[in-house]
C-alpha cells in the first residue's frame, strides 16, 4: 500500500533529513515509526503526502509515484497531524460534511452521523461546535473524516501527544479497528509504550536512517525500550525482568 524505495530528502544543502529509506507498509498493518525529534519521521510522512519533493528515490501509494500521480494518490490517503485542523466555529458534523465533500464524497447529514458513532461520539456531540471539543474528541473527528473519505491508508504524526491515558487508549482502539478493515496505518511517534500497544510492527529511525524494524507480537515493552536506547543513544542497558 505504502512503499518507499531509496527515499531521501536534503534541506538546503544540510545533512540528509531522510537517508535512503526502504520501507513497505501493507494493507491492514499498523506501522509505528519511533524516533527523537528531528529523526526524519515527519519528513517521511510529508514525502508520502507529496507536501515536499524528494531529493532522491520514490514514495509510492498503491504502486503509484506520489510525484507523478499526486491527485490519484491523495484520494487513497488520510492525514491526522498532532493538531487536527478543523474549523472551530463549525460543528463536528459540519466539519465532517465539509471535508468529505472536499475529498469528493458527498453525504446527506443524516448519513454522516454513523461515522461519529463509530468513533465513539454521540449525536449530541456531533452537533456541538469544535471550539467546545477536547483534543481527544478532535482526533476522533479526524478518524471520522478518514472513515467518510474511505481512505485506504492513514498517516498520523504524533496523534496521541497531549492526550490522557483514557483518550490515548480509545484512539489506539480506533486505529486497530481501521486496520482490521484493511486500512494501512503509518504512525510517527516518540511514545514507545503507545507504539508497542498499538502497532503490529515498529521501526526505529535515527538521523534520517531507518536502523531497525520488528514485529510487536511477543515483544516486551522493556525489550523495545532497551533496543531503542541502544540504537538511538548507544546506551547499553541490561535486560530486566518484568
Question: What name fits each language-model region?
Answer:
Residues 165-167:
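Helix N-cap at the start of a conserved alpha-helix in ABC-type nucleotide-binding domains
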Residues 57-68, 72-73, 212:
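Conserved ABC transporter NBD signature motif
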Amino acid at each position: 500500500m505504502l512503499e518507499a524505495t531509496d527515499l531521501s530528502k536534503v534541506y538546503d544543502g544540510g545533512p540528509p533529513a531522510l537517508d535512503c529509506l526502504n520501507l513497505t507498509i501493507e494493507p491492514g498493518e499498523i506501522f509505528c515509526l519511533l524516533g527523537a525529534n528531528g529523526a526524519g519521521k515527519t519528513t517521511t510522512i510529508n514525502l508520502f503526502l507529496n507536501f515536499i519533493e524528494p531529493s532522491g528515490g520514490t514514495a509510492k501509494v498503491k504502486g503509484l509515484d506520489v510525484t507523478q500521480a499526486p491527485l490519484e494518490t491523495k484520494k487513497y490517503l488520510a492525514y491526522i497531524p498532532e493538531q487536527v485542523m478543523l474549523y472551530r466555529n463549525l460543528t463536528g458534523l459540519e466539519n465532517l460534511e465539509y471535508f468529505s465533500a472536499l475529498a469528493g464524497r458527498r453525504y446527506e447529514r443524516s448519513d454522516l452521523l454513523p461515522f461519529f458513532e463509530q468513533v465513539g461520539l454521540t449525536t449530541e456531540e456531533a452537533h456541538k461546535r469544535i471550539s467546545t471539543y477536547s483534543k481527544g474528541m478532535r482526533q476522533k473527528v479526524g478518524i471520522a473524516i478518514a472513515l467518510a473519505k474511505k481512505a485506504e491508508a492513514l498517516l498520523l504524526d504524533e496523534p496521541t501527544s497531549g492526550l490522557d491515558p483514557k483518550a490515548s487508549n480509545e484512539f489506539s482502539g480506533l486505529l486497530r479497528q481501521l486496520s482490521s478493515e484493511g486500512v494501512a496505518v503509518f504512525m510517527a511517534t516518540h511514545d514507545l509504550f503507545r507504539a508497542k500497544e498499538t502497532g503490529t510492527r515498529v521501526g526505529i529511525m535515527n538521523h534520517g536512517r531507518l536502523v531497525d524494524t520488528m514485529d510487536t507480537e511477543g515483544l516486551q515493552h522493556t525489550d523495545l525500550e532497551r533496543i531503542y536506547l541502544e540504537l538511538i543513544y548507544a546506551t547499553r542497558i541490561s535486560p530486566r525482568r518484568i
